[in-house]
C-alpha cells in the first residue's frame, strides 16, 4: 500500500451496565429467558411514555469527561424513524442533533508511537432487539431499550493496528469508569468500521465501505487489512469501489457484502416530544467523579517501579488491577513479582483469572509478611499460595499443618552444619583451596537432608562462621 493511505473512522456501540433500561423500568438481565425482561414501553404499546434513566446520563457524562469532550448542558433526544421488527414502536430514541458529548480525543499507543485520535461525538440511545436467523427469524426483546453510548471517531485512523489500539483504549476506559462490561464476545462492545482508500497526498476521500458489528480485536485487524487490500486491488485494476455495507466472515477471513447503498437513508430525525429538554447544571456535572483512568494507572505503576510487562497486564485487565491494588503491601515492585509469579501463574494453570481463585487479599498480605520475616522461605511461599484458594482459616496454623515453617534458629542450624562437616571431613579440608565447592556442597546437603526448610541465608552465615574458625 505504498501509494495509498487508508482513511478509517470507527463507530463503537457500548452497552451500559445500568440496572434498568434506557427509557423503561425493565430490569436488564442478559441471562434471562427470552422476552421476559420487557414491558409495554419496550414493546411500543400506544399511550406509553419513556422515562429517562439518570444512571445512563451519568455514565455519558463520565465518558465525555474521560474523552476530553465538551458536554452539552441541555439534554435533547430525537427519533430515528425506520420500520424494522427489532424496534416495534417504529423508531429509535437517540441523540442526533445535540449529543451529550462532542469534540473530544483520546491518545493511543502503537509500535509507531503515540497518536491522538479525535472523536466527533458520543450520544445516548437505546439498543434494539436481538435477532436470531434460522429457518425462522426469532426476536428477543430483552435487549430492546438497553442503554447504549455510541462513540463516533473522526476519520483519522490510518491502520488496522491503530484501530485495534483505539477500540481497546475505549474498552479500558469503559471498564475503568465501571460503565460497561465492555465484553466484545458478548456484544456489549461492538464496532462498525468505515474504510476508504486514497492516493497519498490527496485530500479528497475515496468511496467508503462500512463493516458492521465486529466483535473481536482479531476480527477488527483482519477485516481492515483484508478490505484495504481489496480496495487497493480494485483501484489498480480500475474496478469501481461501491458504497457498501459489509460484514466480516471469520471462516473465510473476508468481508462479505450485505447491501449496496444507492443513496443516503433519510431517517427523518425529529425531536422526541415525549422527553422534555433537561438542563444539566454545572453542579450536577461537577459532582460526577471519575475513577482512575488507564493512563493515570499506568503512570502510578511506573512510579511504583513495577516492570513494564506487569503494567501492561494490569492496565489491560481492570479487574486484575483492582485485585492487585487491594493488596496492602508497601513495596509494590516486590508485590508485583510475587503476584505474577505465583498467583497469576496459578490462575493461568487453572484457566481462570487471578481474582476468580478466591484468594483473600488479607491471606496474601499475611503470607508475604511471613516471607519478609523469614518465617517461611520462598520455596514454602510457592507451596502455600495454592493452599489459599477458597481458604478460610488461620495462616499460621496452615503453615504448621503442612510443615512449611522455615528453620532459622542458629543453634539448630549450627548442629546440622557440624553433622555434615563431620561426615565429610576429607572434602571440608579442601576449604582453603576450594572454598566455593565446599560451601556449595555443605549447603546443598543441608537443604537436601532437611527438605529445603532451612533458611539458606542463615545457613550460609553459620557455615562461613564455622569454616573460618576451623581454618583460620
Swiss-Prot record:
Keywords, in A-Z order: ATP-binding, Ligase, Nucleotide-binding, Protein biosynthesis
Alphabetical list of SMART domains matching this protein: GatB_Yqey
A molecular function (GO) term: ATP binding
Enzyme class name: ligase
Gene3D superfamilies xref list: 1.10.10.410
EC number assigned by the record: 6.3.5.-
Catalytic activity: L-glutamyl-tRNA(Gln) + L-glutamine + ATP + H2O = L-glutaminyl-tRNA(Gln) + L-glutamate + ADP + phosphate + H(+); L-aspartyl-tRNA(Asn) + L-glutamine + ATP + H2O = L-asparaginyl-tRNA(Asn) + L-glutamate + ADP + phosphate + 2 H(+)
Biological process terms in GO annotation: glutaminyl-tRNAGln biosynthesis via transamidation; translation
Domain of life of the organism encoding this protein: Bacteria
Function: Allows the formation of correctly charged Asn-tRNA(Asn) or Gln-tRNA(Gln) through the transamidation of misacylated Asp-tRNA(Asn) or Glu-tRNA(Gln) in organisms which lack either or both of asparaginyl-tRNA or glutaminyl-tRNA synthetases. The reaction takes place in the presence of glutamine and ATP through an activated phospho-Asp-tRNA(Asn) or phospho-Glu-tRNA(Gln).
NCBIfam families: gatB, PRK05477.1-2, PRK05477.1-4
Family of this protein: Belongs to the GatB/GatE family. GatB subfamily.
Subunit record text: Heterotrimer of A, B and C subunits.
Protein's UniProt name: Aspartyl/glutamyl-tRNA(Asn/Gln) amidotransferase subunit B
Naturally occurring in which organism (per UniProt): Mycoplasmopsis agalactiae (strain NCTC 10123 / CIP 59.7 / PG2)
